[in-house]
Curated annotation (Swiss-Prot):
One of its GO terms (cellular component) is chloroplast thylakoid membrane. The 4 large subunits of the cytochrome b6-f complex are cytochrome b6, subunit IV (17 kDa polypeptide, PetD), cytochrome f and the Rieske protein, while the 4 small subunits are PetG, PetL, PetM and PetN. The complex functions as a dimer. Its main location: plastid. It comes from Cryptomeria japonica. It is a single-pass membrane protein. One of its GO terms (molecular function) is electron transporter, transferring electrons within cytochrome b6/f complex of photosystem II activity. Belongs to the PetG family. Component of the cytochrome b6-f complex, which mediates electron transfer between photosystem II (PSII) and photosystem I (PSI), cyclic electron flow around PSI, and state transitions. PetG is required for either the stability or assembly of the cytochrome b6-f complex. This is Cytochrome b6-f complex subunit 5. The gene is petG.
Length: 37
């Protein structure tokens, strides 16, 4: 039961972590474009 709970937490955190990294990189990319202008 504990293994199932841990696996569920990991599977739930992975997409959130990837989404957070993607959004952060996207915001930094747009900020760089604005500075170039």
């Amino acid at each position: 039961m504990i293994e199932v709970l841990l696996s569920g937490i990991v599977l739930g955190l992975i997409p959130i972590t990837l989404a957070g990294l993607f959004v952060t990189a996207y915001l930094q990319y747009r900020r760089g474009d604005q500075l170039d202008i």
